[in-house]
Amino acid sequence: MCGIVGYTGDQQAAPILLAGLEKLEYRGYDSAGLAVRDGERVPEVVKAKGRLRALAEKTDNGRAMRGNCGIGHTRWATHGEPSENNAHPHCTDDRSVVAVHNGIIENYQEIREKLIKNGYTFYSDTDTEVAVKLIDHYYKKYNDGPLDAMARAMMRIRGTYALAVMFKDYPEEIFVARQDNPMIIGVGEGESFIASDVPPLLPYTRKVYYIGNQELGRLHKGEVTFYNIDQEEIQKELVTIEWDAEAAEKGGYEHFMIKEIHEQPRAVRDTLNSVIRDGHIDLTEAGLSDDVIRSLKRIYIVACGSAYHAGVAAQYVIEDLARIPVRVELASEFRYRNPILEENSLVIIISQSGETADSLAALRLAKSQGVPTMAIVNVVGSTIAREADHIFYTLAGPEIAVATTKAYSTQLVAGYLLGVQFAHVRGTITEEKYEELLAALQELPDQIAKLLEDDKERIQWFAAKYANAKDVFFIGRGIDYAVSMEGSLKLKEISYIHSEAYAAGELKHGTISLIEDGILVVSILTQEALYEKMISNMVEVKCRGAYLMGLTTAGNYNIEDTVDFAVYIPKTDEHFTPSLAVVPLQLLGYYVSVSKGLDVDKPRNLAKSVTVE
């Protein structure tokens, strides 16, 4: 949530900052601003409410702001309403200290009151202005430089932050600090960059540093020095980003979301190939030994949003194949309920960004109880990846659309791979079954590609027909219920249509009272053992007036006797059907949103990476 960029070098800063903020739009925002300084002059600050184009118009696409050092920000309101006044950057009255900030300062009211007693006044309702003036207070009181002032502020502040600060007395330099909020430092030839995520850096450099918690950085042109909170210089590893820069561009597609839907075959294939070697799944890079796998008594999967849905699917696969009890939890609940974690357990955290605040807190809670942790993440070097005991990297590449598609698909595959390998190591499946499952996994990329080729136009037509629906319900049983949850989320988050997913067996326990004439019900039935029971549930809603869309496996053509619109997925092992069943549901959500003329990639009120509670 929110986005920070920074630049110091020999080029004009403002156009680079604007371009960087554009690549962070997916994180969600309601206002934006820039601060740029030219040599020793005080920074010029320009802000705008609304979309980034308003800021671009104010600054003539950055050309009106002269200077080669600057910071920029897209704000998601947490303290103070969305307004130009509350937008970042924030500064002291004389602009001697200017800063942008992501995160939440929990004790900002207490600090604000003390600063008022010291003669400070405030023009905004934000916690960020409080941080700026606290830094200024320490800077002037102790007269010991920016690092000292920022370190003192860090010790005073409670909460989360990624801070980028410019001081009038230090031209062409930017100072940064971090606590539980993402910040990446890029280094090029004679220039340095700051960003909340990788995409803004890719056009300029692939050499980056990941700044850690309670650490500070000092950026010069092409040079960065890092310090701990005691202001002692520390060494950081320079990491090379392997992502393809073109992956963060639309590449001729109308939206990032449809591009990323079409990138799923490659993302799934790359993730499979990263661990399947010589006909076997190799988890040595994840650090999971066979002895650890054999000793497991329970697995906890903890995640948020779509990652949680991927975890629910993984639960079905792991329990059925490996016979290990699995509990799936929402991270926002897990972290606050004082969970009882058994010995010989494994806590698996799933997060695309590796920075999700609740998931990170859940990881730390598990570690504090001495339970081994594993991260399934898409971003190399992210906080969750760095802090987990074991790491399984998905290879989805940069995902820009707020509504996840390819990252979710790779999370599904990661869950399958763990389930299959755990079963193999523990001897709960035969060698023949292991080989069959591996073969089925490796067919998934081509099957997803075929689905995209065969069904896109039919689903586009159907989506246009139901673009004005008021309510849509998704139903399924077993692993199909996990797919139903993801399909419902995809629809509601980008089309703003009220949608819910229900376990089909629960319909008669209350939900069926919501079914009325013409309401759309999407039924997923890919499990042979549950097929007839699902048909019965579908007949129940149809006789109450529902319009039925059925999604099933090729060969189940008798479904057309019950449904009004049928979609078929290729045959695969039933443990892996979510990877195929979700694709038509992604397309449905996408085309409904397009038909309504909505902003598919940046739906209202949502952020790609939720880094605050």
What are these regions (language model features)?
Residues 68, 72-85, 275-290, 314-350, ...:
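Glycine-rich oxoanion-binding loops at beta->alpha junctions
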Residues 231, 547, 562, 572-613:
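Generic C-terminus detector
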Residues 294-436, 440-443, 524-567, 588, ...:
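Glycine-rich phosphate-binding loops that contact phosphosugars or nucleotide phosphates
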Residues 127-130, 310, 314, 410-414, ...:
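Catalytic-loop motifs flanking and including active-site residues across diverse enzymes
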Residues 264-268, 272-300, 390-520, 593-613:
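Active-site phosphate/pyrophosphate-binding segments
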Residues 7-10, 101, 121, 125, ...:
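Hydrophobic alpha-helical scaffolding
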